[in-house]
């Protein structure tokens, strides 16, 4: 079926294209056409099943009411939870959401940013890689509304939301130490990310304060690409070189979950280790009920991402060029066993 156009409606009613456009955009109050004619036009448009091109209309008005969301991984439970909250909050403000995945790849992330800009989304929410700093700087220079979360660039004038990474990590590791754990390994990934570096610093601080400087054999760096296989190799090495390991600190819930699978496959009891992790997944309740957790405030992170971005978008629309930065550091909820 051929799509009905403004021209078709104008022909059916016997008026100009401009009159139809005015009626469909509610401009009869401006005196361009009478209210009676506007009602007649809108009734005919409904009868003809007219569907407006909202994107084209948005472009004419300088807005699309679309927000771009770039995640490192759509399959990651944390990011999917964040996406759900952002979508709910965005809809409350009249926005649609366009979700993309970068897979933590610099080149892909840059392509996605450029694609979203070409679609003229009103703003972008992103959990960026550190390597994409140059592309983020371009957004800032263009005064493009953008908010980062989970990861950030401390030297850029940028709206961002993160958790208290170092403090939460410090408290988790200190709790393991207070429970008598003396050889605590750390499993981490992507050290180029500021958040991972901060979590490592929290671990290191707790160990050094307790007089237990970190031993190289207890440091497990898992490459993100093919992380399942890489994690197995890292655990093989730790258990071989540090057989007296009695605790694990995981900088992400994914590393913790994969470690639990490794223990299950190798018939290793989780009860012999003290374990702590940033964020949680429901599986922990079954596979590791004694896991100490710093739960990230998913709801608050998602809601504030939308709130800050919306304020930024509205400031731009009203040409309020006063540059303001909102850097939020949110506390985690500690669940210590």
What are these regions, as identified by a protein language model?
Residues 1-63:
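N-terminal helix-turn-helix DNA-binding module of bacterial transcription factors
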Residues 72-80, 100-108, 161-171, 187-234, ...:
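Hinge/beta->alpha junction and helix N-cap segments in small-molecule ligand-binding domains
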Residues 104, 126-171, 191-192, 254, ...:
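Flexible loop/hinge segments that line or gate small-molecule binding clefts
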Residues 232-337:
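Flexible loop/turn connectors
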Residues 17-22, 59-74, 175, 183-190:
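Short beta-strand segments enriched in small/hydrophobic residues
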Residues 2-5, 45-78, 82-84, 93, ...:
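N-terminal helix-turn-helix/winged-helix DNA-binding helices
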Residues 107-120, 229-244:
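Short, well-structured alpha-helical segments in soluble
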Residues 88-133:
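Central regulatory/effector-binding core of bacterial HTH transcription factors
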């Amino acid at each position: 079926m051929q799509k009905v156009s403004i021209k078709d409606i104008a022909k059916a009613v016997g008026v100009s294209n401009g009159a139809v456009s005015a009626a469909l955009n509610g401009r009869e109050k401006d005196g361009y056409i009478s209210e009676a004619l506007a009602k007649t036009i809108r009734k005919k448009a409904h009868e003809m099943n007219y569907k407006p091109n909202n994107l084209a209309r948005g472009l004419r008005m300088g807005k699309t009411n679309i927000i771009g969301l770039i995640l490192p991984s759509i399959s990651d439970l944390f990011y999917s939870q964040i996406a759900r909250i952002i979508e709910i909050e965005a809809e409350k403000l009249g926005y649609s959401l366009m979700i993309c995945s970068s897979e933590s790849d610099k080149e892909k992330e840059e392509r996605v940013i450029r694609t979203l800009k070409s679609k003229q989304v009103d703003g972008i929410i992103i959990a960026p890689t550190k390597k994409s700093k140059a592309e983020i700087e371009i957004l800032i220079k263009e005064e493009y509304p953008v908010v980062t979360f989970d990861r950030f660039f401390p030297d850029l004038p940028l709206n961002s939301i993160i958790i208290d990474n170092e403090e939460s990590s410090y408290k988790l590791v200190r709790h393991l130490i207070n429970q008598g754990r003396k050889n605590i390994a750390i499993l981490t990934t992507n050290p180029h990310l500021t958040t991972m570096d901060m979590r490592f610093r929290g671990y290191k601080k707790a160990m050094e304060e307790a007089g237990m400087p970190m031993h190289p054999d207890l440091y497990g760096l898992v490459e993100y690409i093919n992380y399942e296989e890489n994690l197995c190799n890292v655990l093989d090495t730790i258990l071989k070189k540090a057989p007296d390991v009695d605790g694990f600190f995981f900088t992400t819930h994914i590393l913790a979950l994969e470690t639990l699978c490794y223990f299950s496959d190798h018939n290793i009891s989780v009860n012999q280790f003290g374990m702590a992790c940033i964020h949680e997944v429901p599986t922990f309740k079954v596979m590791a009920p004694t896991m100490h957790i710093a739960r990230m405030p998913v709801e608050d992170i998602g809601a504030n991402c939308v709130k800050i971005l919306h304020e930024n978008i509205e400031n731009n629309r009203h040409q309020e060029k006063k540059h303001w930065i909102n850097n939020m550091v949110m506390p985690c909820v500690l669940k210590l066993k």
